[in-house]
Amino acid sequence: MSETAIQAVERKEKPKEVRSKGFVPGVIYGKGMDSISVKFDEKRLNKALQGRSQKAKISVQVAGETKQCFVGEIQKDITSGKTIHISMQVVEDDQVVKMKVPITFGGSEALSERKLIVLPYFSELELTGPSADIPEYVAVDVADKSLGDKITVADFMVSPSVSVLDDPEKIIAAITGAR
């Protein structure tokens, strides 16, 4: 989980009014709780999400209580790229969740030295397990791969408490020659 919690403030204002004051409107929801309409300071939210995956785990402090959340959906303005709304799902550490997480390929630099590249066919894997054990992303090292090698679901390692729901034989990427 993230080390510091981002502050959320309950809101009654309409989203447009919230945005005009430098905040991002959002909603926090979860199993067995009423949804809470909130607002986040735009700069602090962007800083908290910087370099994180779309489905990042983040601590949110609202009404004096810290909640562990997965980022559900981030809506962006198509012209400015600014975040205009965010939804966050509260989860307990032991709650079993099913979600898609992004894939990363480590060691691509070693491939490029040999004029090879990773050609990804898919960008995420579907996992299930306790929310505390779901990684922000799944990675595979491709540094030692050769031309024509395939990367399958089975090549990705996850915690023993987490299951990958995709077929282990599914080809995720291939190693090809750089153009």
Swiss-Prot record:
Q: What Gene Ontology molecular-function terms does this entry list? A: 5S rRNA binding; structural constituent of ribosome
InterPro entries on file: Rbsml_bL25/Gln-tRNA_synth_N, Ribosomal_bL25/Gln-tRNA_synth, Ribosomal_bL25_b-dom, Ribosomal_bL25_C, Ribosomal_bL25_long, Ribosomal_L25_dom, Ribosomal_uL5_bac-type
Provide this UniProt record's keywords sorted from A to Z. Ribonucleoprotein, Ribosomal protein, RNA-binding, rRNA-binding
Indicate yes or no for the key word Ribosomal protein: yes
What biological-process terms (Gene Ontology) are attached? Answer: translation
Q: Enumerate the Pfam families for this protein.
A: Ribosomal_L25p, Ribosomal_TL5_C
This entry carries the following GO cellular component terms, namely: cytosolic large ribosomal subunit
Family matches, as HAMAP family: Ribosomal_bL25_CTC
Q: Which NCBIfam families match?
A: bL25_bact_ctc (TIGR00731)
Family to which the UniProt record says this protein belongs: Belongs to the bacterial ribosomal protein bL25 family. CTC subfamily.
General function of this protein: This is one of the proteins that binds to the 5S RNA in the ribosome where it forms part of the central protuberance.
What is the name of this protein? Large ribosomal subunit protein bL25
Species in which this protein is naturally found: Desulfitobacterium hafniense (strain Y51)
